[in-house]
Amino acid sequence: MLPELKDSADISISGRPEWRDVEAQLNAAVFRGLLAYLRRYPHTLIAPLMLEVPGKDGARHRLTPERLRAMDDAELSPIVQTVLRPGAINLQRYTGGRGGYPYWHCELYPRDAHGETLHRHLLWTIYLNDGFGEGETEFLYQQRKIAPRAGSLLIAPAAFTHTHRGNRPQGGDKFIATSWILFQRAERLYAGG
């Protein structure tokens, strides 16, 4: 990566035994946040796929925003896990006064032969610290800047509609954990025919 586009120190923790507990804690926190996000924006889950769920009468019913919002976590979680999956988690450090990701970008693009980057549906960031100036996540079309607050979770669509950048922190380093929420691969989603 060119430093004028992105200047950070990154480590991927996914699949590394020494980071397994941290990865599990981050994924659990993000999943809790995702359930709340889906209740607020139910079409995130139901617009891409016409989902059906069994009703109390045993018949299958289309999953509507109202049905989704009424589900408790125990009902909603298996549906979400059937459709979506976590991405590889990166820890990133942006050095104060120098680091950042000033290039306007989105998270959905063709890159690898398996099309993993094209399966990205949502992005997420957990801010691991604060106490520095600027360093916001800025969304171009929404004309919005999200100020980092330690422990807060940001979830947003991965597509160009949420083109964003990471502004340079001032007066201190910025640390984040970040990844994506991806669709399951079609082979898995449609394995039953």
Language model features with spans:
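Fe(II)/2-oxoglutarate oxygenase catalytic core
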Residues: 1-153, 161-193
